[in-house]
Amino acid sequence: MTKTLVFGHKNPDTDTICSAISYAELKKAQGADIEAVRLGELNSETAFVLDYFQVTAPRLVQTVANEVSEVALVDHNERQQSVDDIDDVTVTAVVDHHRIANFETSDPLYYRAEPVGCTTTILLKMFRENEVEVSKTVAGLMLSAIISDTLLFQSPTCTQEDKVAAQKLAQIADVDIQSYGMEMLKAGADVSKKTVAELLLDAKEFNMNDNKVEIAQINVVDVNDVLSRRAEVEALMTQNIVDKGLDLYLFVITNILTNDSVGIAIGSKTAVVEEAYGVKFVENQAPLKGVVSRKKQVVPILTDTFAK
């Protein structure tokens, strides 16, 4: 039997890690030889989740073609967000809830993408469609992913399907959604011990009308906890622009209590962000009122503005 590795995007978040583990459990129950791995370090929120449910973190890998010939992707499809040697392996399956871009295969594959708030919402359907029982531990991980991606149902990406799935998973995991959810989000929003690199850990690269754009996001309970370190943050953002040849680096600092954000933008195309949101960046900083979702409120808007 051919072994498969399953993983989410680089700079993994809670959905990416929990989806990879959950997908692997589903496929193992069906007799597959599969292992969940990760493409980067865990953030503090995900570390809290794995510790809470006593789950070992997936193994960290830099490349995959040296181990397997087939892989499955969760929570992403764009090649620049995936493992560096993605072109050297065959993608046999994708389960995702993002836009489809920069993705093609030479062979048919299983591809499932739905416009929901979280990948594990889709995975719960797949467990049920295949009549595979969701364990208490996996239910906890899947619930955590939904809470994370929807900001405890406050994000505009959240759908009724996500809410229903979360209720079902909470029953299996035997946790209270509100109390556990706030504890989890606050664990991720504590930036007091984070390095500057960790502040920018949740970053994704996009191609927008032939422009290289990186968008990082962090959830906090007080944006000043990050803005007080703005000089360090901007220095690292600038270095990333040079190292990666980026046209724009946008850092979205989201207050999970007010559901607003502040943006820091650096690069030759910062004017695109100003046009997209009708704001003016002062010393690289501008308010992004009501913006909490990179997937729904940042990527599509910037993509459209770059295309003008």
Curated annotation (Swiss-Prot):
Coiled coil: none annotated. It is an enzyme of class 3 (hydrolase). Its cofactor is Mn(2+). Keywords: Cytoplasm, Hydrolase, Manganese, Metal-binding. SMART domains: DHHA2 (SM01131). Signal peptide: none annotated. The keyword Cell wall biogenesis/degradation does not apply. Gene3D superfamilies: DHHA2 domain (3.10.310.20), inorganic pyrophosphatase (n-terminal core) (3.90.1640.10). Mn(2+) 1 binds at residues 9, 13, 75. The gene is ppaC. Binds 2 manganese ions per subunit. GO terms for molecular function: inorganic diphosphate phosphatase activity; manganese ion binding. NCBIfam families: PRK05427.1. Its main location: cytoplasm. The keyword Cell division does not apply. One of its GO terms (cellular component) is cytoplasm. It comes from the Bacteria. It catalyses: diphosphate + H2O = 2 phosphate + H(+). It is found in: Cytoplasm. It comes from Listeria monocytogenes serotype 4b (strain F2365). Mn(2+) 2 binds at residues 15, 75, 97, 149. Belongs to the PPase class C family. This is Probable manganese-dependent inorganic pyrophosphatase. Its EC number is 3.6.1.1.
